């Protein structure tokens, strides 16, 4: 293990429109090439579309989508005596959130609507209703962990 000190967590400010830290993290993950204003317009545009389509509070629906995508358990590789085992481990809360955000954005980018706003709003609505690619990714992760439950005694 490294004896150096860990990098300090950076302070992030809540987003200006909703005052939500998670939306800011989501925005930062959507951002490409440092273009924050573009990412901001994409995320806010998607939340506006969600509000129009679902006729409900977009922030609550956003958090519901994140909760539905976040994995509770995942597998990690562990080498034991020449064999590599996929060992199921619990996911820390910070990692759960980071994975959920990453999976939602990747699933949205893989959709075939025309604009990113439409793709993101569609994926968020699907995830809030337990459908879509991001939820499928979470199910696959859980299925993998369940299949390798026999190796759970190799936990570290």
Curated annotation (Swiss-Prot):
PROSITE patterns: RIBOSOMAL_S7 (PS00052). Gene3D superfamilies: Ribosomal protein S7 domain. Pfam families: Ribosomal_S7. GO terms for biological process: translation. Keywords: Ribonucleoprotein, Ribosomal protein, RNA-binding, rRNA-binding, tRNA-binding. InterPro entries: Ribosomal_uS7, Ribosomal_uS7_bac/org-type, Ribosomal_uS7_CS, Ribosomal_uS7_dom, Ribosomal_uS7_dom_sf. The keyword RNA-binding applies. It comes from the Bacteria. CDD domains: uS7_Bacteria. One of its GO terms (molecular function) is tRNA binding. GO terms for cellular component: small ribosomal subunit. The keyword tRNA processing does not apply. Belongs to the universal ribosomal protein uS7 family. Part of the 30S ribosomal subunit. Contacts proteins S9 and S11. One of the primary rRNA binding proteins, it binds directly to 16S rRNA where it nucleates assembly of the head domain of the 30S subunit. Is located at the subunit interface close to the decoding center, probably blocks exit of the E-site tRNA. This is Small ribosomal subunit protein uS7. It comes from Brucella anthropi (strain ATCC 49188 / DSM 6882 / CCUG 24695 / JCM 21032 / LMG 3331 / NBRC 15819 / NCTC 12168 / Alc 37) (Ochrobactrum anthropi).
